[in-house]
Each structure stands twice: as C-alpha cells, then as structure tokens.
Design a protein with these regions (language model features):
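Substrate-binding and catalytic surfaces of secreted/luminal carbohydrate-active proteins
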Residues: 1-9, 13-26, 30, 121, ...
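N-terminal catalytic cores of secreted or lumenal carbohydrate-active enzymes
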Residues: 8-188, 209, 219
Length: 383
C-alpha cells in the first residue's frame, strides 16, 4: 500500500480470507469463460543515463537498490526492461554500433561495454527471468538519406529516413546486435524496428512510415531473424496512440498486419502515451485480436508535476498501469529507471525536463526519491 502522503510507503499487508458466504457490500463474480491476456511483465528503461547514475553509487548501495527493484523474492519483482540499440536521447553520447561504413565494422561500443552490459548483468544475477526488449533511435548515419524522394545522404543524428538499399545491411545490424548480447549472456526477448518512427525531432531519430516498416520487416528483418534462428519477437510501431496526427499513418500496425508477408513476422505492436487516447489499444485489439500489445514508454517531468505524488500517483495508476492492462497490453514499461536530481544525464535535443522513476542525489549518489512511476510498477510487479 502506498499513499500520496507516504504515510504508507509500499507497505505490505497480510490479507485474511474468510469462508463466510456474505461478502456484502462487495462481491466479485468470476466468469471462467471470459479470458484476457497473459502478462509478460512490468518494468522500466535501463538507459545509458540510468546506468551512469547506478554506477556512481557504492556497489553495496547499488546492489541493494537493484535487489529491492528486481528481486522476485525479496523485492518488488520488476520483470521487463527496455534498452536502446545504439544511442537514445538518454545516452552519454550519440553513437550506433556501426558508425564506420560497412556492416563488417559492427561492434558493441564503449557505452554498452562500460555501462549497459555491467548493469544488465547485475540485474540478471538478481532476477535471471527478466525480459529485455530493445529499439534503435537511429540507424547508422551512412544508411540515412534526406527522404525517399531525395536520396541525398544525411549525416545527422536527427531526422532522415533509411535508404532502402541498406535494408539487408540494417537487418544484419539487428541480428549482429542480438547475437552480441547473447554472447554476453543476455537474451533479447523482443525488438521494435524503430523507436517513435513518426518523431523527426528527437536528439537521435529516424522517420519510418508504416510502408517503410512493413517493407523492412517483410523483406529483411523478419527473414534474417528466421535465417539466424533467433526467437526474438518483433513488435511494430512503438509510438503514440494518435500516430502524430498524420492521417496516412493512422492504424500504423494494422496496415502492416494487412500484409501477410510482414504480419507473419510480427508478434504485435507497442505504444507510447505522449499523444492520443488509450482507447486506440482497444481499437487495435478488436480489429486484430490475435496480435499482442505492449505499452513501452511514458514519462513524468516538470510539465506534469512529475514529483508530486498527490497529483501523479493515482492518475498514473489509472492511465498508465491499469488503463493499459485493461486494454489488452501484456507488458507495461515506463521510461528511465533512474535519473539524478538535475534530470541528468540527458542530451541536447532530447528530453531535458524528464524525471526518472526514481531520482538520485548527484552529491553522493546515495539518497533516492521514488516517483510515481516507480510506485505503480512496484505495485503491479508485486501482485
């Protein structure tokens, strides 16, 4: 139990069940014939910024926090993690795993070796059953063009589109990345082809219409995953309920499902809540009931009183947690697990007003303040 005044702070209460027939004024009726989705888990993003902050902590303090967060025996049992393939807007620098032209130059980079992998390995030592999903914020710059009608190379981390001539190389990039993490003892449960494919303006971004994503999945990514024997799931879309109000992009994953060659490789679709209404989840489920749904990103920050539990706790439980589960999502993942008290590290052009699920003081990297997103995921994971 958690109250917004923190008079009760993730308090555990024993429940005494009664055999009495009269449960008035409350009764619960179960209908075994009506079944809903099974749950894959609940969690947060382990970004470069999160890992940086965690690794500033004393090892004993860090391990205690990670145990409290991820242990399904002595902690809250967070069970789903989202990471970036290459950089995100909360990385320590802009990079991909193949910045030198030629897919033969693929290699994990220093941020992954020095920050991401050590933290993931520590988490997995605490809870080996954690599911990890991943998404790129951008392809390598040598694969980018200004647009599909102007194939001029674009050497910018922001905006641009994937040159179709590099579909196969980019699919190989995904395969090599999944295999590289596997070689480090880390299984990747799922990927999306692109984080926020309709967002041209992030510090690292790549525009990818539904037609582009369909063609990339059916001609390159799906076949290459199959040929490599990868069991990693592929989820479409990974962006907002409102499709950025672009008429031609509405029903983005549904249009991909209508293509049988692409659909065979797609487990489902992933959504964020920075625009539109969660009713779109129900619309997609009703139209494509055999496809899965995930909720993969939401943020708190200065714009929505993100550190004020009296304003955020119940609202986030209603809209983010229960609102997505009640609309068929199998997983719920919030954004940065940990930022510091200055909302850092962050990237210019990315979100510099976001809070973490927890914030840690950057004076001594010891004092941690839990925000609403930590509480809602902790409550869901503990059930």
């Amino acid at each position: 139990t958690t109250t917004n005044s923190l008079t009760r702070d993730l308090a555990r209460d024993a429940v005494n069940f009664s055999s009495k027939d009269n449960l008035a004024p409350t009764s619960i009726t179960l209908n075994p014939a009506e079944q809903y989705q099974t749950m894959d888990g609940f969690g947060a993003a382990i970004t470069g910024a999160t890992c940086f902050n965690l690794l500033q902590m004393k090892p004993a303090d860090r391990h205690a926090f990670l145990t409290e967060t991820f242990s399904d025996n002595s902690g809250f049992g967070f069970s789903y993690i989202r990471i970036s393939i290459g950089c995100s807007d909360f990385s320590l620098s802009e990079y991909t795993c193949c910045d030198t032209k030629g897919i033969e130059n693929f290699a994990l980079q220093s941020e992954e070796k020095n920050y991401i992998l050590p933290v993931l390995k520590e988490i997995l030592s605490i809870n080996p059953s954690i599911k990890i999903m991943a998404a790129p914020w951008t392809c390598p710059l040598w694969m980018k063009v200004k647009s599909l009608t102007d194939l001029t190379p674009l050497t910018s981390w922001t905006n641009g589109q994937l040159n179709p001539a590099y579909y196969q190389d980019y699919a190989t990039y995904f395969v090599k990345w999944v295999q590289a993490f596997k070689a480090e003892g880390i299984d990747i449960y799922a990927v999306t082809p692109q984080n926020e494919p309709l967002n041209r303006g992030n510090s690292a971004s790549l525009y990818m219409s539904w037609e582009e994503q369909r063609d990339f999945v059916k001609t390159a990514l799906g076949p290459q995953f199959a040929a490599a024997g990868l069991s990693t799931k592929i989820y479409a879309y990974d962006h907002n309920y409102d499709y950025s109000n672009i008429e031609s992009e509405k029903n983005y994953p549904g249009k991909m499902y209508e293509d049988g060659e692409a659909s065979q490789y797609l487990a489902g679709a992933a959504y964020h809540n920075y625009g539109g209404d969660r009713e779109e989840l129900l619309n997609i489920h009703k139209a494509y009931p055999d496809k899965e749904l995930l909720f993969t990103e939401t943020s708190i920050g200065t714009w929505n009183s993100g550190r004020d539990l009296s304003k955020r706790l119940l609202e986030d439980m209603k809209e983010v947690a229960l609102g997505t589960i009640n609309n068929w999502c199998k997983g719920v993942i919030v954004w940065n697990l940990m930022l510091d008290n200055d909302r850092a590290p962050n990237r210019e052009g990315g979100c510099q007003t976001c809070y973490g699920a927890v914030d840690i003081s950057n004076s001594y990297y010891k004092t941690i303040i839990r925000n609403s997103h930590y509480y809602i995921i902790a409550h869901l994971s503990s059930v």
